[in-house]
Amino acid sequence: MAQQRRGGFKRRKKVDYIAANKIEYVDYKDTELLSRFVSERGKILPRRVTGTSAKNQRKVTTAIKRARVMALMPYVNED
């Protein structure tokens, strides 16, 4: 039988940053906003990490890819 965990902690619900701040258009030129959704290695973070909705994640992904093509953001950060 499965044992119930005691003294566990509640996970905090992740909030969609874009919806919370009422951002309607995710601009590829806004690298400060886009850098919130990119790891330190330069990879796009998944929804389960950032807490964004599916619709906003698609907007963020296309904006990051456009910024990379326009050389506003790096493809890979190697430190």
Swiss-Prot record:
GO terms for molecular function: small ribosomal subunit rRNA binding; structural constituent of ribosome. GO terms for cellular component: cytosolic small ribosomal subunit. InterPro entries: Ribosomal_bS18, Ribosomal_bS18_CS, Ribosomal_bS18_sf. The keyword tRNA processing does not apply. It holds the Pfam family Ribosomal_S18. SUPFAM superfamilies: Ribosomal protein S18. One of its GO terms (biological process) is translation. Keywords: Ribonucleoprotein, Ribosomal protein, RNA-binding, rRNA-binding. PANTHER family: 30S RIBOSOMAL PROTEIN S18, SMALL RIBOSOMAL SUBUNIT PROTEIN BS18M. NCBIfam families: S18. Belongs to the bacterial ribosomal protein bS18 family. Binds as a heterodimer with protein bS6 to the central domain of the 16S rRNA, where it helps stabilize the platform of the 30S subunit. Part of the 30S ribosomal subunit. Forms a tight heterodimer with protein bS6. This is Small ribosomal subunit protein bS18.
